[in-house]
């Protein structure tokens, strides 16, 4: 999968093939639904076998499906598949975890860190403004960026404009033993 054209993580939990991907819009939607809880905390809770965890899981799937299915349908699908031994609950949780990992910047990216504030909220408006002003994306395009793609674009922009030194992909001869 290309970092600039992420496909998302394929998952089938309700009879439909879907691709889960954490775009800026998905993160913002989740933070709107749960304003006091950061995205990483929501996903951690969704992995637990508690009522609160299941509610977070339903909201996360709802946001990842962009509202194309109702929360009731998601809950019913998870309940039916789990009771029939399909292992759907764990499949969906694994897909969510993988989608988050694939959508976030590499841990070494330092220019635009994905930091949460004290409450654990990622500042999505900052990413939208930069994507529209600096990169010329429309609002719709900016909402559909992953934070990983945003980070790659920002690194390239900063390097091209001399704001950041280009990282060499090779080892100079003087560093060889």
Q: Which role does the model predict for each range below?
A:
Residues 1-177:
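Charged interaction scaffolds used for protein-protein
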